[in-house]
Every structure is written in structure tokens, then in C-alpha cells.
Amino acid sequence: MSELCSVPRVSERFAQSNALDEDIARLKYVSGKREEALRRLGIRTVGDLLLHIPHRYLDFTRSWSIEMAPIGTVCTIVATVDRIVQKQPRPRMQVTEVSLVDETGVLQVAFFRQPWIAQQLKQGDRLAVMGKVEFAYGFKQMASPHFEKLEDGRAAGTILPVHYVSDGVSQAWMRRIVSGALEVVSNPFDPIPARLRVKRRLMSNARALRSIHFPSSMAERDIARARLAYEECLYLQLALRLRNDGGLVDVVPYAHTAGEHLAALKQALPFSLSDEQEAAFKDILHDMCDGGRVMNRLLLGDVGTGKTAVAACALAVAADSGTQSCVMAPTGVLARQYADKTGPLLSQAGMSWALLTGATPAAEREQIHAQLESGELDVLFGTHAVLSDDVAFKHLSLVVIDEQHRFGVGQRNALRAKGPGADLLVMTATPIPRTLALSVYGDLDTSIIRHRPVPGAGVTTRVLTESSRDLAYGAIREAYEKGQQAYVICPLVEPSDSADELEDVPGIARDDEGRVTVPVPLHDTATELDRLRLALPGLTVERLHGRMPAGEKDRVIDAFKRGEIDVLVSTTVIEVGVDVPNATVMVIENGERFGLAALHQLRGRVGRGSVSGTCLVMTHSKGNGGASAAQDRLQSLEKTSDGFTLAQMDLRLRHEGEILGYRQHGGVTLRFVDLDADEDLIEWAHLDAVELLRYACNLDSVATRPLRDAVATRYRHIFKEVSGG
């Protein structure tokens, strides 16, 4: 362990940690309105301020004269304001024209719908502008460029950071404040052991913080970002693993053994496990039979890849060992579906099972409780109802959680507490890139199933604009005439709903601050229900959404499964748990509002039987600007059916939280890590976290305690989950 960690001087560590925890009000230049503005940005301490990194930079080390600036490229030009003119070429269209001059020529700059710029600038001001250079009417021009007023003594030849700011703090003041904070912590203690810094060739913490805010070159900025990204990843990995291990202190892992139940179950399966399924089960079996450690495994599988069959094999191993297992699903529909599909296979393998949900009658519930306590039941399928205090197992040794991102850590731990030392298998059908899985689910070992064991009929996807709506309705009518069914998916429940109602929609589009962005119009289930009943006379159309009582939801889904409903208008509540092989058409309204991974999940609800499915994604994109980009993104759905490929595309375009659903990863925001580009760095952090905890359990040694303190400070909300706070 001495190679990994050296013991820091306590006085040095204490002084520097105190400096980072200092309130921003103690900093030079911070008082009154500036303090309020910083707090609005979530900046309360010196540490918060130093982690509030620039979102872009103005690189004046590569500035051009007006004459030499190449047309058609993005350039930085430093010049002087010569003239400011405001125009209004048409109603509600305001243009501020600024003429910039240097010794080589004139640059005409136009700012659209930004009238306040005329008040910010005056003749003689020295400006740096960065934008695409165009040529028209005899002059070089820029439209709405990024600009910086050079009023703080900085000249061309430097790199200026551009931070997110709030009213009351200008960019110039933010730079002064950050510079003052860096002086306060001029040599901050580095919690990452020196051995790791050398091994990974990392910049020191002090230099990285200075270089990320005030780099001497963009190359230096990149090296600083890499250091801070590694630190962020390592801290997150450690926080997740410490949280996970927090409830496992002093437990004795159970060593399972495979036997007759497993052999009988494999015989009962209607197909042989694919190579990928066998590999995943081999991982699980190795974990379950290892009496030296408790299993913590994530099973990732695209829609229809056969995760349930793999999980059923794990249930059989638990039964072979004379112990019990519990499968918890997020909805009653999904729990019942598990019981309906997996239960008969378990029965054929000689295993007993039961289903427990909130709708289970009292008498049946009491019988299940008694059978669990006596050990008569091998497997319990259920919802949150299994977390009830009166549910007790004789010997619970395996916990399986499906769509685990829909459960909180507390719920996961509450179920696991019913069987101290129980192995944990969590599953999700949301394709997640490996880098994201390592970062956000770093406390879990991962097995991946990418391909379907038995190729299905497949799904054809088309992106349609509003002008092609008749094609969508025609597809629904055609399916009905063939005796098939359809889904219509809307982002909202009621027409009166606002953006707030979209907060938990997986993959919903957001701005840089995480706020839902809403176009007009947004489709809702109530309006769409009425519209479809008018457009498709003779068809039975009903709706489904998450606000309905559980019993009503079950009634609608059961009716749809029985074929009594021809068209189901629904929110994304059907994304998980509705398996109707006769449903062959899906129409998704406002497709541009969803991430690719979420759309892929939705279309996985059709084409599940012997008949191929059709998914029609409706969009209001007009084909220009950002709308064109949205349409290009959607068209990638037409080209690939691989959920992991789509998830990787999503990762390049959207925040990590939008792939998982904004709150599903516990409020963790990755500031520095580029999940698309930092695969090696993320792998390093993962390996180093495992090694650190192997040598220093809980990081509670003298040498590693500073690192634990730093992790606890950065991810204090995760550590609260350890202590139940």
C-alpha cells in the first residue's frame, strides 16, 4: 500500500481543505450583488467556484487581422468599435450593427434580437470577436459572434476563459474573483496519492485548477481537463463503491452450487442460450459460487436479447443451493409479466414461486408471507410491495432487480437487507455505452448481451413530418384490418400540462442548464385520444398514462393484451413492461423531444411476435438550423437497430443524464469527463478505484483518509445514502 499512498502532513491538509470550504463572501471582490449572483449559480464555497469551469475560451493566441481572416472559417479578430447602428427591418426583428476596424480593414458585425448590446458598447472600445467570417456587399462580416470587451487589461496573445455568469457578475469580474480564489488556495493539498499521479502522468491539482481557468495554451487546458476528469471519475467510482459496501460490512457471502434445478430449467427453455447469454450467465455463476465476495452485477441487454432467461438460470442456482430469491420489478404489469412468462418454466424445473404486488388480496398475501418464512417458496416476484416490513424470508440469497434505474439506492438496499450477504443482479434494457456504465454504475461489474438469441421479425422505422400524418393513420388502419394493434405515444398527459410534466420522461430534450425545452405544439394523450377516435371510426381507442390508479392501468393493459383495444394512446409508461406480440405499429408524436436510446426502447414494444413491426416517428422539424440537426439525429433510427450504437450517438449529442433519464443516476453531473472520448481515462479510474479499496478497505487508513474526505465532500449526497441521511 505504501506504493499507492503517502501520508500527508495533517497541518497542510487541514489548512488547504479549510480554504476550499471557505464561504465565497470571504473572497476579494465578492460582496452584495456579486455574492447573490454567485449563489444563484450554485457557488457557495471557494471549492464550488474553482469547479465552476469555463464553458469555452476566446483564444487570442491565434487572432487574425481583418484583412487576413479567411472567409468561411471561424476566426478570432481583435479590433476597435468604430460605429454602432440599431435597425428594425421588420416588426419584432431588431438588428444591432457594429463596425469594427483595425489597421487592415473593416469588419461588419450584426447581432440579431440583442438590442442591449448597443448599451454595452461605445465607440473606441476594443473587442475580440469569434465567429464565422463571411463576405457580402464588399465587406467581411460576422453574424452574432461570441465577443469579449477587452476592459480588464488583457491584450491579444492570451486565452480568456468564458464562464457561465449571472446578472451582477460580468465576465471580467468573474475572472478577477476566480483569480483571487486561486491565490487563496495557491497550493491546494492533492488528495490523489502521488503514486497514482505519477503512474497516470497527471498534472498536480494546483496547476490543473489554474490551467483550466487561465491556460497558457489550449494544449495545457486539455492536460488540465484530463487531470480533473480523472479525479472526477476516480472520486465517483470510490463514492459508488463505498456506498455499495456501506451496507455489506460484516456480512458473510453465500457460496451457491448449481444442480438439478438449473439443468431442468435449461431443458425447459424453448431455445438454447446464445453464446452471449452463456457468457453472461458464466459471469453470474462465477460470482454466485464465489464464497469470498458478494455479487454486485449489472446485466445490460438490448430489447429482446433474453436477459430474463439468464436471470431465470440464476434463480435456479439459488434454489439448487437450498435458498430463496426475489425478483423486484418497477410496475405491477412487469412483475406479473415476469411471473406469467418465467413462472411456468420454474415450475417445470421443480421450483415453487409466487407473485406479490400492491393488488394481491390480503388472504393470498398472508399465505405468501407464511410460505416465505417457512422456506416453502423458492422465488418471489413482486413490486415495491416486497419491501414491506412484514415480508420476511427464511434464507434470501439472491436479489434480482429489473430496470434498476427506476429504483432508488435505498430501495435496493432495503430489499437486500432481508438477506444479509445476498447476491445482487440488476438488469436494464436501456442500452448504455460502456464508458457510461463504468462511470455511473461503477459499483457494479458488468455483463453485456448485444444481440437477440432468436432473431425476430424486426422493426422498420420511418421519420415523418406533420404533412405525412395521413400515412401514419393509414398504417394504423391497415394494421387493424389485418387484426393487429397499434400504439400512439405522446409526451404529455393533458393539454394543460407544461414542461414540468416532462421532467421524468427518459431522454427528453434539455438546455445546457438541464431545463426541459418545449416546442409548440406538444401532443398529449387526451387530445390525441379524441383526434384518433374521429380519424379512425370503428376502431376502439383507449389511453394509458402514469397518473392512472394501478388497478385502472392494469385493466387497460389487460384489455389491450386480450385484443379488446385496437389503438392504445399512451405516454412512455409503456416503455417497460408491456409485451403484446400482436401490436405491430407504433406512432411516436414529437419524436424530436426524445433521445435516441428512449426512442429505441419505445419501438422495441412492436415487432415482438412473428409479424414485423413499423415505427413512425413524427417530427415538427422543418429542415433548417437546429431542426435539421434534430431530423438528422432521428434519421439514424432508420439506419440502425443496434441500441448500443444509438446510445453512443446519443452520448455525443446529449448529457449522460438524458440517456438514463435525468434523475436516474442519482443527481451525478459529470463536469469534466467526456464519455465519448475519455474511454481510457475512465478505465484507469475504474481500475485504480478497485485497487485502492482492495488495499485500504473503506479508505480508512491514515494514508487514504484524505482521499476519502475529498470523495465525501465532492459526492456528499451519495455518502448520505450510506448513512441513511
Set out the residue ranges of the language-model regions:
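Long, highly charged, low-complexity intrinsically disordered interaction regions
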Residues: 1-28, 36, 236, 246
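Upstream accessory/linker segments immediately N-terminal to the RecA-like ATPase cores of bacterial MutS
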Residues: 34, 71, 87-268, 662
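OB-fold nucleic-acid-binding modules
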Residues: 52-82
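Short, surface-exposed secondary-structure boundary micro-motifs
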Residues: 80, 132-133, 239, 591, ...
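N-terminal pre-P-loop "Q-motif" helix
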Residues: 271-295, 309
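Inter-lobe coupling/hinge segments of SF2-like helicase ATPases
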Residues: 290-635
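Accessory helical-bundle/CTD segments and flexible terminal tails appended to RecA-like ATPase motors
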Residues: 558-581, 586-589, 604, 608, ...
